[in-house]
Amino acid sequence: MPVDPLNGRREVTVSDVAAAAKVSKATAARVLGGYGAASEAVRDRVQAAAEQLGYHPNALAKTMTTGRSNSIGIIVGDIENPFFAQATRGAADVAKAAGYDLILLNSDEHAVAEENAISVLLAKRVDGILVAPASTTDPSSLREAVERARPMVLFDRVADGLDVDTVVADNLAGARRLAQLLLDAGHRRIAFVSTIAHADEYRVGVRLGSSSVDDRVRGFVGALADAGVDDPARFVRLNARDGVPAVVRALVDDGITAIVASDSLIAQAAFRELRTLGRRIPDDVSLVAFDDADWTSLSAPGITVMAQPIHEIGAEAARLLIRRIAGDGAPTEHVVLPQRLVDRESIAPPRS
């Protein structure tokens, strides 16, 4: 006899509803599960009995019967990052409109945690999975879901060797444009700062573990190289997850006059450290970033950013996934959405 753990009362079962509606258990199950045939009069009696008794469907039982859970899993890299909060909201808006619940899990950008999250979602029998992959170059943690024919869509990043739909922003073009703004202002000693883990100093041609960061670095380095800056890769700073202030201090000591932050959290840490060091933005150091976080428009000065269509990235990923769940067998899609420059007051010519 199932008991509700919250109030200690016996849970209302399909059998209870069937008895109250004076129909068979199989008929009540069909009506409550939304499958099979039943007359309108029978449906009305069953639904009225269910409402009167306070019946709540057993999600697992419904999944076993219909093969669908009407749920979607989403795995993000860092739930504290505003990017993932907005992308998740976009996915949730589309999922809700289509009748799906969303289950959110965090990978902390680690493949092992991502693999565990995949296992949890498969155990919950989700109908499909959205993932911002922890690694572009080694997506082995995602293969179980693909091998089990569970629809999957990647967002924000791609993953080598996985034939699945992807939705990303045009990070290559966005980085080139940010770098060009600084070059046009007269800067030559421009640094790019990211928290992505990387074993060695950055070298041109080396793939980074996140395709979004890799595209940004390549766009940044390409713009500087085209402008004749000698060995622009030497200005790329990685592995700053726990040490953005230390990286900024070293850059200032090295005579850097401008910084491109790979996301708004890095930009915020850099902004604070420059203030701590007594450096004025943009008079002493220019600062630009990816992502139009709220603080970038409220700070003094406002920060020039490359705004990503974050809500739309999540929403489009969910749309693609729901189409796959419905059986769409079209070739996989790689959707690239444009970014938008928000020009504020954080760029000035370098001091002579």
Q: Model-derived features: where do they sit?
A:
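Small/polar loops that bind or transfer phosphate-bearing groups
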Residues: 30, 75-76, 106, 130-133, ...
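N-terminal helix-turn-helix DNA-binding module of bacterial transcription factors
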Residues: 1-70, 348-351
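Bacterial carbohydrate/catabolite-sensing allosteric modules
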Residues: 2-6, 52, 93-98, 147-154, ...
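Non-catalytic, surface-exposed connector residues within folded enzymatic/regulatory domains
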Residues: 11, 39-43, 58, 66, ...
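Residue-level preference for short helical/loop micro-motifs built around acidic side chains
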Residues: 36-40, 112, 283, 312
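Alpha-helical recognition/docking segments in bacterial nutrient-uptake
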Residues: 1-15, 44, 59, 67-184, ...
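Hydrophobic packing within well-folded, soluble alpha/beta domains
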Residues: 14-23, 28, 38, 46, ...
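Short beta-strand segments enriched in small/hydrophobic residues
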Residues: 20, 27-30, 65-79, 189-206
